[in-house]
């Protein structure tokens, strides 16, 4: 077959004209090395700090992602989020152009998820309508509102001595096995019916411990308003490091929409250790205790996101959909100390960032005083302004009495002869200590808490044997529940503005009427306590 040269040229022309050239520009690189979940990638010239990188999928087709943390001249250091055994040298890595995001919204409530927001409770997929970035800038000074609403934990010793407000950061610190998690779980359980969404972030704990916490929350009905973010000890250091930020983003969803949320980080010591591990593997220079130089920033940027935001911020964020409402995210970070050393690097960092600390002591815990709160060094820097008047009126001298009692008790064991005033103070302190004991998973409403503190302040427990103080309290509470339900309801309803001071001539009629209600309620409480004391054997 012979082709005409003219036909050949026409054929070539038509082929050239019909050729579709499309250029797909992608920023991709090559894996240089993989070690302990740390991947060094060459060629990602446009990668951002904290950007998600796409790695080759696993054998079953599950996508693999990493987090770009080190941006160097010739390479990028990244941590793999999840399994990394299938990634090998020479593999292709692509930039996604996105910062790490997790699902947020009410769809997550009642679920147990991992650090990436993926369900791990076997209850099926989560159909969240939104995702949000895990790293955010905390609200500025102008967007914030002062803390003036209480966040009741239901624990007598905390709500009376170291009260926590909505939007506060209150550190729970102590050695291992001193009841730190128990305090946080009780606080979550006590939020039932308080319009508070809770987030519990478990970092570096045993899977069995996390399972026990979830079971306790389910039994108390607290999973109806709680999200559990779990990064157990079996997961990679990267997942443990990221989990706290993921949980914070889930809590911020509610804060920014004019709702109240509580987040528990259990615990930040393990997060700091995970971050140290990642940093050392990335060859970052170590500092004090081998932590990297930015370990303070690790926790400060996380805890500063817990805040109470004003109505203008909420209105601007929701574009006018929510008006006149403030939002709050209250944080209860937990730090584990070694042999009570609060001056170690991470504990001092977090103490300086937070608005107070609840210090749990091993010696008190072993002596059966639970929660084992040391009244001397536990403090709340902003919570007193958020404390309800009902509790504030009764708890004024409790903390001082308890701190002085512990000091006196230490000296009294060496003294053979004590004066009457000292002996009275020791007796009173022993009874207050006994009354502040509380079993786990039994938070108290403010009305019953007030009744307990009232009985102490009025001296009803002074001549009762120390071993009978708790039975006295239990019996008194039962009497109030059965015979004085209306009184308890009055205290619950009016507790925030409670006022028993004598009425002034310039008080409005409404204020005078309110004071009369409070005074009558206190008189009824006094009569009930007097009557019960006579019948108590």
Curated annotation (Swiss-Prot):
ATP binds at residues 174-181. Pfam families: ATP-synt_ab (PF00006), ATP-synt_ab_C (PF00306), ATP-synt_ab_N (PF02874). InterPro entries: ATP_synth_asu-like_sf, ATP_synth_asu_C, ATP_synth_asu_C_sf, ATP_synth_F1_a_nt-bd_dom, ATP_synth_F1_asu, ATPase_a/bsu_AS, ATPase_F1/V1/A1_a/bsu_N, ATPase_F1/V1/A1_a/bsu_N_sf. Keywords: ATP synthesis, ATP-binding, Cell inner membrane, Cell membrane, CF(1), Hydrogen ion transport, Ion transport, Membrane, Nucleotide-binding, Translocase, Transport. It catalyses: ATP + H2O + 4 H(+)(in) = ADP + phosphate + 5 H(+)(out). GO terms for molecular function: ADP binding; ATP binding; proton-transporting ATP synthase activity, rotational mechanism. It is a peripheral membrane protein. SUPFAM superfamilies: C-terminal domain of alpha and beta subunits of F1 ATP synthase, N-terminal domain of alpha and beta subunits of F1 ATP synthase, P-loop containing nucleoside triphosphate hydrolases. The record marks 378 as: Required for activity. Produces ATP from ADP in the presence of a proton gradient across the membrane. The alpha chain is a regulatory subunit. F-type ATPases have 2 components, CF(1) - the catalytic core - and CF(0) - the membrane proton channel. CF(1) has five subunits: alpha(3), beta(3), gamma(1), delta(1), epsilon(1). CF(0) has three main subunits: a(1), b(2) and c(9-12). The alpha and beta chains form an alternating ring which encloses part of the gamma chain. CF(1) is attached to CF(0) by a central stalk formed by the gamma and epsilon chains, while a peripheral stalk is formed by the delta and b chains. This is ATP synthase subunit alpha. The gene is atpA.
């Amino acid at each position: 077959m012979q082709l005409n040269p003219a036909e050949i040229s026409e054929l070539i022309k038509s082929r050239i004209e019909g050729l579709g050239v499309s250029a797909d520009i992608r920023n991709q690189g090559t894996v240089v090395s993989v070690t302990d979940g740390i991947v060094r990638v060459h060629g990602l010239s446009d990668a951002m700090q904290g950007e998600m990188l796409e790695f080759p999928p696993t054998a079953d087709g599950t996508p693999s992602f990493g987090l770009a943390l080190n941006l160097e001249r010739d390479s990028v250091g990244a941590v793999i989020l999840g399994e990394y055994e299938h990634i090998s040298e020479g593999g292709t890595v692509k930039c996604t152009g996105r910062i790490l995001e997790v699902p947020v919204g009410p769809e997550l409530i009642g679920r147990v998820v991992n650090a990436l927001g993926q369900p791990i409770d076997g209850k099926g997929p989560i159909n969240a309508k939104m995702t949000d970035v895990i790293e955010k800038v905390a609200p500025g000074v102008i967007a914030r509102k002062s803390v003036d609403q209480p966040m009741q934990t239901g624990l007598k010793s905390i709500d009376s001595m170291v009260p926590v407000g909505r939007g506060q950061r209150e550190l729970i610190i102590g050695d291992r096995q001193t009841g730190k998690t128990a305090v946080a779980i009780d606080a979550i359980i006590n939020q039932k019916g308080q319009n508070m969404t809770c987030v519990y972030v478990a970092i570096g704990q045993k899977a069995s411990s996390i399972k026990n916490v979830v079971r306790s929350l389910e039994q108390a009905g607290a999973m109806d308003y709680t999200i559990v973010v779990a990064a157990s000890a079996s997961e990679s250091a990267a997942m443990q490091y990221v989990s706290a930020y993921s949980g914070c983003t889930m809590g911020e969803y509610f804060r920014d929409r004019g709702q109240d949320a509580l987040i528990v980080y259990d615990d930040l010591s393990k997060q700091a250790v995970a971050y140290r591990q990642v940093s050392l593997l990335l060859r970052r220079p170590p500092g004090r205790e081998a932590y990297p130089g930015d370990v303070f920033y690790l926790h400060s940027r996380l805890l500063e996101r817990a805040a109470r935001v004003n109505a203008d911020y909420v209105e601007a964020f929701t574009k006018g959909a929510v008006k006149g409402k403030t939002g709050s995210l209250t944080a209860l970070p937990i730090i584990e100390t070694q042999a009570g050393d609060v001056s170690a690097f991470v504990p001092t960092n977090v103490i300086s960032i937070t608005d107070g600390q609840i210090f749990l002591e091993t010696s008190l815990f072993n002596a059966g005083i639970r929660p084992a709160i040391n009244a001397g060094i536990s403090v709340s820097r902003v919570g007193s302004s958020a404390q309800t008047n009902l509790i504030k009126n009764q708890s004024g001298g409790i903390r001082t009495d308890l701190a002085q009692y512990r000091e006196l008790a230490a000296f009294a064991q060496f003294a053979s002869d004590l004066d009457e005033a000292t002996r009275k103070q020791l007796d009173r302190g022993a009874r207050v200590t006994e009354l502040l004991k509380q079993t786990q998973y039994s938070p108290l409403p403010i009305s019953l808490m007030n009744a307990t503190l009232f009985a102490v302040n009025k001296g009803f427990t002074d001549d009762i044997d120390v071993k009978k103080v708790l039975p006295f309290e239990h019996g008194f509470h039962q009497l109030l529940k059965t015979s004085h339900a209306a009184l308890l309801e009055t205290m619950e309803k009016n507790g925030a503005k409670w006022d028993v001071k004598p009425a002034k001539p310039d008080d409005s009629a409404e204020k005078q009427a309110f004071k009369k209600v409070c005074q009558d309620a206190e008189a009824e409480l006094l009569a009930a306590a007097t009557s019960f004391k006579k019948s108590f054997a």
